Amino acid sequence: MLSRIKQGIKTKRSSSSSSSRSKTGDEDSSLMLRWVYDNDPPLKQTDTFQYLMAPTAPTDKASSSYIATTYKVDCKVEIISRASIRNFDELINIASCLIDSYDGQLLIKPWIITVYLTIITHLVKEPDTHGVRSSVNRYHNGFNEILTLYINKNFAPENKKYSFKKNLSTTHKGNQCNIIISIDLLPTDRKGKSIKDVYEVKMPDNREIPNFQQMLKPYNLKVKEKNGKYLISHKMSSSDDSIDVSDSDENEF
């Protein structure tokens, strides 16, 4: 799991490293990634996105208002900041610049924003290399997994490939901060895991998972949890703060 990120970090190490650094080097690399907050304990890689090791769940039938959309998701988000990120509020303040900068297709917005927020809430910090402190702080994560998200049928995307790439620039504590987003959605006939299970993966220090509904609201999206699934639709007006699922067949979820 997270092999792509692990490999990416490892390649940044000096190519002149001796092959004789066997056991000690391997043990050190097991704690390379740290949790996003600088004052938190190191994060073991085995705790990061543990769900990727679990078997995929069967796809549920669609309700009368929402349909299951399934994609193979290949995604990565990286934040590069001169000033360190000290807490969750600072992180969300940086990540929220996408609210005004989203220019992707309307039909895939629920997917893009949900995946984006899932990664943002599970970012890890790249440590200093060989004890040398870098002039910038890098926070990143990503995954490659088949996932299912329930979308209002009036806004359901087509069964085709979608891609969203974005480089955003903002400031953090008066310093430049960049956000690099790469999300690919590939159509598949395979069964997917509920994205709710992904978003609610425990954080390493067991802190409370941010409320998904509150996280989505600034992006003009609304979500309803039903039978362990997220049902997502676009928020059409300022007074449109809830989802009516009364016409959905309870047995179909």
From Swiss-Prot:
Gene Ontology annotations for the cellular component aspect, listed alphabetically: host cell nuclear membrane; membrane; viral envelope; virion membrane
InterPro entries found in the cross-reference section: Vesiculo_matrix
Organism: Tibrogargan virus (strain CS132)
Region entry Disordered, spans: 1-26
Subcellular location: Virion membrane; Host endomembrane system; Host nucleus membrane
Domain comment quoted from the record: Late-budding domains (L domains) are short sequence motifs essential for viral particle budding. They recruit proteins of the host ESCRT machinery (Endosomal Sorting Complex Required for Transport) or ESCRT-associated proteins. M contains a PTAP/PSAP motif, which interacts with the UEV domain of TSG101.
Chief location category: virion
Superkingdom assignment: Viruses
Keyword Membrane listed: yes
Intervals of motif PTAP/PSAP motif: 55-58
UniProt name for this protein: Matrix protein
